[in-house]
Amino acid sequence: VQRDYMAGEVSRDLTTRMLLPHDIVEADREGIIHFHDSDYYAQHMHNCDLVNLEDMLQNGTVISGTMIEKPHSFSTACNIATQIIAQVASNQYGGQSISLAHLAPFVDVSREKIRKEVISEQELVGMEYPEDVLNEIVERRLKKEITKGVQTIEYQVITLMTTNGQAPFLTVFMYLNEAKNEREKKDLAMIIEETLRQRYQGVKNEAGVWVTPAFPKLIYVLEEDNIEEGSEYYYLTELAAKCTAKRLVPDYISEKKMKELKEGNCFPVMGCRSCLSPWKDENGNYKFYGRFNQGGVT
């Protein structure tokens, strides 16, 4: 942390003496404007961003010169996600957000993997389970894997340190309608439920007392199928409210209002509260994940 502060002072000096136009520097000194984050400006780092976790998990990525291929289970996907979070946090100075919807497809990958394992075990002992029993065994093991994966993210984020000596400022986005189909939506609901349960429980401090971790922050989206009592996912909203009452997270976003304000789109803020403006790529598609914020001026 001290090294980061020292580097920041050097950057601030270079920014005011050499990099910024004189009129901008003078306006900042006189209080007409405030040029933010001059302690990082010399290296042209960006502030906060939305991590395109989906692209890196589905198509693979490279970390420290090592090829990371598409994961073959939910728990591995969660582990890779924490590595990506650490690398992103070490190369920017603001917050970052990931979406649980980008992890949801790997629940079914694990489901099929576990099913094959259970069938193999049947053959080993020379017996065959009825289909309903087989499905129940698979789902029980799957829930254990989801618990393990969510716990990996929770504990990795609060225990790892970035290159500037801090834990990553991470926000986790929980948006059911981001799922691509009904099966994936149900799987996403399981991840959201486990995330809320673990946050409600908290983590133990050095004295063994359950406390509220600072990160990751949580954002829960209110939508048509979880806002009304009796709706399919209302139980998640009840759990979220219970969690907020005890742990002060999640924060909430109204899908309906955000779509009114953001040209029909609903997406996470970047870390804390900075929210992107709608933008379309060269193909006319809205793009949010993979974008960042830089050069803030008040």
Question: Residue locations for each model-derived region?
Answer:
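Conserved catalytic cores of very large enzyme subunits
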Residues: 1-298
